[in-house]
From Swiss-Prot:
Enzyme class: transferase
Name of this protein: DNA-directed RNA polymerase 35 kDa subunit
EC number assigned by the record: 2.7.7.6
InterPro entries: DNA-dir_RNA_pol_35kDa_poxviral
Short name of any one Pfam family annotated for the protein: Pox_RNA_pol_35
Gene Ontology biological process terms, A to Z: viral transcription
Swiss-Prot/TrEMBL keywords: DNA-directed RNA polymerase, Nucleotidyltransferase, Transcription, Transferase, Virion
Organism: Fowlpox virus (strain NVSL) (FPV)
Length: 302
């Protein structure tokens, strides 16, 4: 078996565990391949079926060497599939696809992963020499800006054909940044459990440690920018987290504020008001506890 499930368990303060869980789900996400263009299709599957299956590809187990750059949005990626059925072909697998990292300065083609031959993408109908089946498509990670400069850099594309088909479908492409979460995490009562998968063709420990390194960086920035708006709640009704210095009433309406003030003794939930003096908050102490827990997760990786 090329795939193995495993889990990491770490105990922490419940507020710290909740904060880390939400930060993972917010920041450790992989963009979907939702910008797809079918150039040629004579298979039994319609274009929409091809694009739906491509959008859901588990790209984290393919672009693993670039996971830090991907989640930090420092690069994009794309795939290109061009396959014509031959007499002995009965299916298309993920190994039939070419995979590319797109950086501002270069386009990098990934080395083939032979184990992907075991992951089926499409089954051909019975081979007939007079009616061969062909599929050619390209798909880009969500957020990729498709323009002439990029298309001209992608030497594997027939520029004229791609531009013609892209013009026909670009209006239906989502403008939202669409992502998926490549593992599962729960944190009931401070007990963090992370459920992941290992694959034989890459070092899962290095991969996940790269993700945690980025998580520590983005959390550091977020805590450094943490601030609770002060206002007079007798005059104004807050919509975001806020604090009334006169009454020592805090309104909690975001995850970071909730976790920080809970860490320092408040017992609150989102969308609630509480009597609490925020002078007891020390974000450096909170940040230190977060980093300690992430380091424990890091050490538990094997």
């Amino acid at each position: 078996m090329h795939r193995q499930e495993y889990r990491i368990d770490v105990s922490a303060n419940p507020s710290i565990a909740t904060f880390i869980k939400h930060m993972c789900k917010k920041h450790l996400v992989i963009p979907r391949l939702n910008v797809g263009v079918v150039m040629i299709n004579t298979t039994t599957a319609i274009n929409e079926e091809w694009l739906t299956s491509i959008e859901s590809l588990p790209t984290h187990k393919i672009f693993y060497d670039y996971v830090y750059d991907i989640i930090a949005m420092q690069c994009n990626f794309c795939i290109h599939l061009k396959k014509t059925q031959k007499e002995n072909d009965s299916y298309i697998s993920l190994a039939d696809i070419d995979y590319y990292i797109i950086k501002p300065e270069e386009v990098i083609k990934l080395d083939p992963i032979k184990e992907l031959k075991e992951t089926l993408l499409h089954s051909f109908s019975e081979y007939r020499a007079t009616n061969t089946k062909t599929i050619e498509l390209a798909a880009f990670s969500s957020g990729t800006k498709i323009n002439d400069e990029l298309v001209n850099r992608l030497s594997f594309l027939d520029t004229e054909l791609f531009n013609r088909e892209y013009k026909n479908v670009k209006i239906i492409h989502s403008q939202n940044y669409e992502t998926y979460f490549p593992f599962s995490i729960i944190a009931p009562e401070g007990n963090i459990s992370i459920f992941m998968e290992k694959y034989t063709w890459f070092n899962s420990s290095v991969y996940f440690k790269s993700m945690l390194s980025y998580l520590k960086e983005v959390i550091s920035d977020q805590i450094a920018e943490f601030n609770i708006t002060k206002l007079d709640m007798e005059k104004d009704t807050p919509t975001s987290s806020a604090y009334d210095p006169k009454s020592n009433i805090v309104f909690v309406n975001d995850i970071t504020t909730m976790c920080i003030i809970n860490f320092f003794g408040c017992e609150c939930q989102l969308g609630t008001y509480h009597k609490f003096n925020i002078s007891s908050i020390n974000t450096k102490t909170f940040h230190k506890a977060v980093n300690k827990t992430i380091s424990e997760i890091y050490k538990a990786i094997n």
